[in-house]
Amino acid sequence: MAVKNLEKGINVSGRVWKSEKDAFRATSKVIKNKKLTSWELKREQRQLDQQFKERMNALKNEKEEERQQRIKALRERREKKEEKERYERLAARMHAKKVERMRRREKRNKALKER
């Protein structure tokens, strides 16, 4: 009894003759093959639900990202096609060198705008 008190420290009340008592029931101690309490079951279920939601969100985000990439690629293709057609229409009207100069100038202007 005195050994327990020395390990733990002296009582605040100063009653050194009081012995340290253990729990009568073993419910608070870890027991092998112990059934989970309802609170622990709920906690585990919440964790599983949270993991499921995270996985679902990750899949949704991945799917949306792929969709956005497809849309972006399609938009770029359309813009390139449109620009090519426009240059062809201009080339039909003007001399080839002049069209090439215009194309370079527009690229330069576009680069300046994007800065």
Swiss-Prot record:
Role summary: Involved in nucleolar integrity and required for processing of the pre-rRNA for the 60S ribosome subunit.
- What are the annotated GO cellular component locations? nucleolus
Keyword entries, A-Z: Coiled coil, Nucleus, Ribosome biogenesis, rRNA processing
Which GO BP terms apply? rRNA processing
Which family does the UniProt entry place this protein in?
Belongs to the CGR1 family.
Look up the signal peptide feature and give its range: none
User: Is the keyword rRNA processing assigned to this protein?
Assistant: yes
Q: Which gene encodes it?
A: CGR1
The record's annotation in InterPro entries points to: Cgr1-like (IPR005579)
Q: Where is the composition biased (Basic residues)?
A: 96-108
Q: Where is this region: Disordered?
A: 96-115
Location in or out of the cell = Nucleus, Nucleolus
Identify the Pfam families for this entry: Cgr1
Where are the annotated coiled coils located? 40-101
Q: What is this protein called?
A: rRNA-processing protein CGR1
Q: Quick one: where is this thing mainly located?
A: nucleus
